[in-house]
Amino acid sequence: MEKVLAIVGPTAVGKTNLSIDIAKKFNGEIISGDSMQVYQKLDIGTAKVTIEEMQGIPHHLIDTKTIHDRFSAADFKETAQKLISEISQRGKLPIVVGGTGFYLQALLRDLELGGSNEDRNQIEAIRTELNQKENDELLSILKTIDLATYENIDRKNRRRIIRAIEVFKVSGQKMSEQQMQPTAVYDDLLIGLNTERSILYQRINHRVNMMLDAGLENEARWLFDETKVPQANKGIGYREWQDYFKNEKTLSETIELIQKDSRHYAKRQLTWFRNKMDVNWYDIIQNPQEQAKIYQKIENWLGVKNELER
């Protein structure tokens, strides 16, 4: 069974820096587990790792799609599985890093996402029908067929709502039930980063301000001008600008909304990982010494003794 290390947790807790340190110490390559970092030219709002920050560590599933492309959990799972095999064959450690919980669960627990052509044709027909409905109607359908998913889903994420309904209609099984019956396909270790909520929220607010200083408004305007419909336009940090660009919100209201949505997303990320996956949690923000504990945990899992200082 191939080994896979995953670094998970909410936004703004230091996953990127830790993953690069770990990759350097344990001969790893990094696979992005973020649903937005696949998109080219969306660098600021996705907090995409820079070439300098990579420090020569190979990174995968970054800048592989245009903003007009769809990128689903099924696409991620299929591509990441191939990457894991290739990285393992090179004698390196695959390290999946990100906060998109469903993508990671689909990969590590082999969730059935409708991979056959027949399934995909059926999904397309269902999706066409569902796309004609208003959000309130979709939520009502989801509440009827899968209350557990309804209670935890992001009400603003139309794509995820439709996906949850599709799963039920194609498989006859609730998404929430499917996620409760995981099948391990890798020898995986999940390292989770988190910190005290007030500190986390301060870091999120600060990160949004840094994104604004780096040019987030211009990046979002470019995306808005390019197209009004793609999946990429639905991400946090981008979707909030639409009313501002239509002169329906002020700049300060838009910034406040991005910060609010980001905080809510972080809360949902934590809930997901705590409820759906077996994660080993650490707080390296308040307790930097815990990073050494993470290295020890990885060493024990790998069954090797790795020199921490090289």
From Swiss-Prot:
Q: Which Pfam families match?
A: IPPT (PF01715)
Interaction with substrate tRNA (site feature) positions: T100
Q: Which domain of life is it from?
A: Bacteria
Query: Where do the segments described as Interaction with substrate tRNA lie?
Result: 34-37
Which reaction is catalysed here? adenosine(37) in tRNA + dimethylallyl diphosphate = N(6)-dimethylallyladenosine(37) in tRNA + diphosphate
Q: What is its EC number?
A: 2.5.1.75
* UniProt binding sites for ATP: G9, P10, T11, A12, V13, G14, K15, T16
Residues that bind substrate: T11, A12, V13, G14, K15, T16
Swiss-Prot/TrEMBL cofactor(s) = Mg(2+)
Keywords (alphabetical) are: ATP-binding, Magnesium, Nucleotide-binding, Transferase, tRNA processing
Q: Which GO terms describe its biological process?
A: tRNA modification
Please list the GO terms describing molecular function.
Answer: ATP binding; tRNA dimethylallyltransferase activity
UniProt keyword ATP-binding present: yes
Task: Check the record and name the InterPro entries matching this protein.
Answer: Dimethylallyltransferase (IPR039657), IPT (IPR018022), P-loop_NTPase (IPR027417)
Q: What does this protein do?
A: Catalyzes the transfer of a dimethylallyl group onto the adenine at position 37 in tRNAs that read codons beginning with uridine, leading to the formation of N6-(dimethylallyl)adenosine (i(6)A).
Fetch the NCBIfam families from UniProt: miaA (TIGR00174)
| Oligomeric and partner information | Monomer.
Please name the HAMAP family in this protein's record: IPP_trans
> What family is it from?
Belongs to the IPP transferase family.
This one is known as tRNA dimethylallyltransferase
Q: Which organism is it from?
A: Pediococcus pentosaceus (strain ATCC 25745 / CCUG 21536 / LMG 10740 / 183-1w)
Q: What is the lineage of its organism?
A: Bacteria, Bacillati, Bacillota, Bacilli, Lactobacillales
